[in-house]
Amino acid sequence: MALAVLRVLDPFPTETPPLAVLLPPGGPWPATGLGLVLALRPASESPAKPALLVAAVEGSGAQGEQRGPGPPPLLVSRALLRVLALGPGARVRARLVRRPPALGWALLATAPGPGLGPRVGPLLVRRGETLPVPGSRVLETRPALQGLLGPGTRLAVTELRGRAKLGQESRDHSHPPPPPVVSSFAASHSVRRLRGVLGGTGDALGVSRSCLRSLGLFQGEWVWVAQVAELPNSSQPRLAQVQVLEPRWELSERLGPNSGQQPGEPLADGLVFLPATLAFNLGCDPLEVGELRIQRYLEGSIAPENKGSCSPLPGPPFARELHIEILSSPHYSANGNYDHVLYRHFQTPRVVQEGDVLCVSTAGQVEILEGSLERLPRWREMFFKVKKTVGEAPEGPASAFLADTTHTSLYLAGTALSHVPSLPSGRSPPWDSLSPPGLEALVNELCAILKPHLQPGGTLLTGTSCVLLQGPPGSGKTTAVTAACSRLGLHLLKVPCSSLCADSSRAVETKLQATFSRARRCRPAVLLLTAVDLLGRDRDGLGEDARVAATLRHLLLDEDALSRCPPLMVVATTSRVQDLPTDVQTAFPHELEVPVLSEAQRLSILQALTAHLPLGQEVNLPQLARRCAGFVVGDLYALLTHTCRAACTRIRASGSAGGLSEEDEGDLCVAGFPLLAEDFGQALDQLQTAHSQAVGAPRIPSVSWHDVGGLQDVKKEILETIQLPLEHPELLSLGLRRSGLLLHGPPGTGKTLLAKAVATECSLTFLSVKGPELINMYVGQSEENVREVFARARAAAPCIIFFDELDSLAPSRGRSGDSGGVMDRVVSQLLAELDGLHSTQDVFVIGATNRPDLLDPALLRPGRFDKLVFVGASEDRASQLRVLSAITRKFKLEASVSLANVLDCCPPQLTGADLYSLCSDAMMTALKRRVRDLEEGLELRSSALLLTMEDLLQAAARLQPSVSEQELLRYKRIQRKFAAC
């Protein structure tokens, strides 16, 4: 993409669309003819993001523009500058789009009126923007977010009534607002209080234009900033400049589902954005900066040399000498040579005060490789602390100077240990937050454990500050620890325990001691040991390594007071606490478990992950969060990755038969395309299938009541037991509810199908458990399998646990005859888990069995499986007809087919499985007939397969009931026996 400079043309021609670009003659662009389409993006933006497609034409206003050295100019309106969040003279990347995407479908919203009129030629439109027709807006476009609206575009029109009104984009932006005029003598000298928020860039305070006027300050003026504390002199003021912070937004947000509203909201008048380093030096809490006191800087004056004018605004003097110390960190070596890094940093004058921590950027610094550990650029910033400043300090609240390469001599005085400010790590915004979505409670608990050891009297605390964090892989353990360290200003040293494993115990011991020694050199710090269960095991992984376990325990319980000031805290993560040696586990006085994500937490994570992505109007994130029951943070991130991949596959498949060319794909990526609900659905199915096969993760089946024929009374009883507590929890405030349901009856009557349909209709996750699969040969493993089933169900709540063949899992105790009493213990564990369901409101248990008389009687007592529902065979023709209609509703039947006549040829006693066998046999007969007709050339391959009356009658003649009349009578006797109890 070529580099270009934006020049404001004022006034902008009224006959030209406000978001178009005028090309001066003689530029690098080809002859426009009927016009060009350019893709524009700010020069600092990533090339992977969508760009803004604009029309480029030659206009009368472009004739007088003189081409000078440097990038070619583009004449634009102020409206386009606002869209790109840039100012006049900004540089952009411009790319010629030779084949702009042609929109295949678009949804337009129009106000009541004459509607759309005819237009000659294609029209370049963007989702969320207004059309030249008054009162019309583009709500949705396919396949791209922006493209050409032409004769081949299918239009869907809806009324604008009830939707968001036209925002500020419909107003005329060709003329800028009048600039603020504030005289110096009218400026206020009083102290003002503003609410601080962590944010902004650089070293300056960010305020809105109206707030700057209300403060009586000028752009770039120096002010004293201090915390508003109850105790006097508790916070030493810091010097900073005031800059107007313009609201910014990304193009993907502008073209998102809420793009009809103004993307960038103006800053509140009483709000000030504080850079992280300045907030740290002020002693502010990163989460809640609180109220700040702003006072004009009245002392000193900057008199630039060799200039004909000087600023009337007062400013701090330059320091003659600046003595700094490098702060020890695990991400860079404190013994490296960073003269060039410091020289480039101080080429711009910087404010320095004694005790301040300076953040020096290493972006683009190749020299940092020489001083980096392992010769890798592991950290984007380096930290230094101001030890002493020498200069003529004017009288004021504190001594503050400016330091640069011209007026100041810089001395590096050594190393120091100190807290550091929390800065963005360069990861995506959800994981770079001080309160990661879905993990706020865990981060708060970690901070509550670590913070007392950082207080002045923290060395007097008994016990170590070691935390064991347990959670499944991908649950956000490392993210939570990183956020806690950022809140507390701690260094973080991440060490995967797989890198500490070695061939001998002595080598592992040496690596452990070196790791702890390295962490102590950069205190206060947190040493994060991931997968700590890998340590303390022998090479085969079967037994414990006593030497390694003893060494790790000794390092964790080190009580040396000198080494704890500043402290070194250890956080270890594991997926299974049971795999950790007992001696190591007892060395952690604090154990935390990553909580299961609730539906609200999953929704907040999805909203954070998709905040900068264009979504289709039909995407329902709350419904998607409901379907992701049991997912951890990593699963939701993988869901988004699979969704993007599915969207790319869909876009490629939507092209011509030969596929999209490389140029077409590039133009489509520049225009951007939304993520649709079908992309999320396809990705979710892939993940749920993979999880179900790997770990038995619960999922929601796709079975509805239309798939279940008959059984109306059974449906009613099941819904009263399960649906009522979900829809009206206030009716069950006394805790009186049924959580267990037992379906019994002959085989093949649809007991499993009923349970799946209930899960689908009530939007519940479904966890199917076969009785024999929980039995294990090892002692205690069968009981643990039962506990894990209920734990997975609680994690995926609201959930239904379906126990099929329950009589094989929970027979009557004392009759099993096994030598170890395994079945008796399994039944006892199952009873204990069922009793604990009363504390979990959204977990239901459904059991299915053919022989309820073989079950342990304790299972059928109140509070467990206290609702018995008999699912019998269909005996009357009306119920059999409903079942047969449900099975054949997806078949293509001939018009002459009569299902009632088919049933007249069948035996009287039929179960649902028998009727399914009838349809399967008839379909096989139809397939054989189809193959025979194709071989004889009597039928085309493209014709549909029809099920004829003859096929069904042949299958009915061969049908034999799977349950005899004697067996049905026996099942009815069992029903009467349990109904009388």
From Swiss-Prot:
The terms describing its cellular component in GO are: cytosol; peroxisomal membrane; photoreceptor cell cilium; photoreceptor outer segment
Q: Where in the cell is it found?
A: Cytoplasm, Cytosol; Peroxisome membrane; Cell projection, Cilium, Photoreceptor outer segment
Which residues carry the post-translational modification Omega-N-methylarginine, per the record? Answer: 119
Report residues binding ATP: 471-478, 745-752
Q: Where is it made, tissue-wise?
A: In the teeth, expressed in ameloblasts and odontoblasts. Expressed in the retina, at higher levels in the ganglion cell layer and photoreceptor layer at the joint between the outer and inner segments.
Give the Enzyme Commission number.
3.6.4.-
A Pfam family matched in the record: DPBB_PEX6
Lineage: superkingdom: Eukaryota
**UniProt keywords, alphabetically:** ATP-binding, Cell projection, Cytoplasm, Hydrolase, Membrane, Methylation, Nucleotide-binding, Peroxisome, Peroxisome biogenesis, Repeat
Which SUPFAM superfamilies does the entry link to?
P-loop containing nucleoside triphosphate hydrolases
Q: Alphabetically, which GO biological process terms does the record hold?
A: protein import into peroxisome matrix, receptor recycling; protein import into peroxisome matrix, translocation; protein stabilization; protein targeting to peroxisome; protein unfolding
Subunit-structure text = Interacts with PEX1; forming the PEX1-PEX6 AAA ATPase complex, which is composed of a heterohexamer formed by a trimer of PEX1-PEX6 dimers. Interacts with PEX26; interaction is direct and promotes recruitment to peroxisomal membranes. Interacts with ZFAND6.
Q: Can you tell me which family this protein belongs to?
A: Belongs to the AAA ATPase family.
Question: What is the documented function of this protein?
Answer: Component of the PEX1-PEX6 AAA ATPase complex, a protein dislocase complex that mediates the ATP-dependent extraction of the PEX5 receptor from peroxisomal membranes, an essential step for PEX5 recycling. Specifically recognizes PEX5 monoubiquitinated at 'Cys-11', and pulls it out of the peroxisome lumen through the PEX2-PEX10-PEX12 retrotranslocation channel. Extraction by the PEX1-PEX6 AAA ATPase complex is accompanied by unfolding of the TPR repeats and release of bound cargo from PEX5.
Q: What name does this protein carry?
A: Peroxisomal ATPase PEX6
What organism does the UniProt record list as the source?
A: Mus musculus (Mouse)
